[in-house]
């Protein structure tokens, strides 16, 4: 399958590598708004690049991994230039119908993972959630996803919105809490690395226990002495509010 990559960020860097490794596809080109990004990914994938939408070459499938705001502006021009192609976006929070009225064949290819350009991942372990505008296209998208992942799921736009919301809680907010922890430790000269065994064990536990059953800490028993003492140690008002709200939420839901 001839594939054009629209975008050259964290997700596309990892997906591009996975598609190339699958040996069943030809990455015909990388497009990005910035030459530096397009050139860097194209070099990794040994394929041409462009920054001009009018110069995007013919492909069977175009996979779009760009900011949500950019997606809506790219679709009209890209679909007009390549009316017979299949178009897939990779956004967890965008509806499939963003293509409606522009493309004949379209769908969603959403790999749910946190990606960084310089951090290798095993793409076969990453769940990919797919959707398409008809059954024939859905079969193509499923087969494409199966070449890079062992966990392919069909999900509607409505379901995917909630999946993405859950991912924000499980990943983005959790990582922000790591950052807050690092900011607490730094003035005391304590390296963040001491937290890693705790973080790893917390993640391991939910492989065997539900998150509800795995919850520990002063908020479980609502130990107000500890909670109030720790809140008083926090200088930043926003961080203090986060501590208070999370403690209350833990207590209320147990």
Regions found by a protein language model. Give the residues of each.
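Short active-site oxyanion
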Residues: 1, 26-29, 59-62, 83-87, ...
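Interdomain hinge/lid region at the active-site interface
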Residues: 186, 200-254
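Rossmann-like NAD(P)(H) cofactor-binding subdomain of soluble oxidoreductases
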Residues: 35-40, 44-120
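Internal alpha-helical scaffold of NAD(P)-dependent oxidoreductase catalytic cores
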Residues: 37-44, 120-162, 170-207
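Short, well-ordered alpha-helices that flank and scaffold nucleotide-derived cofactor binding pockets
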Residues: 13, 17-21, 43, 76, ...
